[in-house]
Structures are given as structure tokens and as C-alpha cells.
């Protein structure tokens, strides 16, 4: 989820509705915060699953720290 947000996912309302249906109140609240930044990560030009796995393995999450900062203030 965090990787998708960092890539620019913007379906927060839809995801919040799904979280509510699954009774995931904390996730629903987090998705409704509207504090996320879109990181302009170059798209993976090679759809090879191995290359995508390498990208995910080495990826540093950006918006997770945003949520922690929000709750720890």
C-alpha cells in the first residue's frame, strides 16, 4: 500500500470505504488524513517481475514516516 501511495496512488476515498467494509478503522483513519506526498518515482520501464522485485526490495518508504510524524507530534 505504501509503495502505491509513493507512486502517486490517489484513490484514498475508495480505499477508505473498503477499509470500513473490512472493519479496519485505523487504516480507514490513516487513509483519510490527506497528508501524503506524491513522490515522483520514475516508472519501471521493464515489466520483468524480477526487476520489479529488485525495485521493491531496495525501495525506501516515504509516506510511512509521514504517518509516524503525524501521530508522534
From Swiss-Prot:
It holds the Pfam family ASFV_360. It comes from the Viruses. GO terms for biological process: taxis. Belongs to the asfivirus DP63R family. This is Uncharacterized protein DP63R.
